[in-house]
Amino acid sequence: MIEEVKLVIGMAVLQYGNLRIDPNQRRVYVHEQVGELTTMEFNILYYLALHPGWTFTREQLYRYAMPDDFASGLESVTSRIYKIRKKLNINAIQTVHGYGYRFEK
């Protein structure tokens, strides 16, 4: 469950414990420290966090997070999930074996 949602210029700032995701500034904070993510990493994290508990396939995440002209494959989603976990040191993104990923508190 989202602990706090603030509407700023129409986009929700999400807060889950020590993790805050601000789509307006395109920033992620962990323990109030800025986490550096690429655009695609941010898009994946925000989309998953916006729908906690929902499970998405790699294809669904790819279509949401990747620009239309990005010619990478679905494996790029797996790679970016790994990088998000490593950069932010969070366990909120769960792997659903044989299907995809979901965000859990």
State where each predicted segment sits:
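A structural signal for short hydrophobic beta-strand segments in well-ordered beta-sheet cores
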Residues: 19-21, 93
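Conserved hydrophobic "DFG−1" position in protein kinase catalytic cores
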Residues: 21-23, 30, 103-105
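DNA-binding patch around the recognition helix
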Residues: 10-13, 36, 79-81, 85-105
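A cytosolic small-molecule/anion-sensing beta-strand core signal
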Residues: 23-24, 97
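Basic, amphipathic DNA-recognition helix from helix-turn-helix-like DNA-binding domains
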Residues: 1-16
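Positively charged, aromatic-enriched patches within helix-turn-helix-type DNA-binding elements
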Residues: 27-39, 43-80, 86, 91
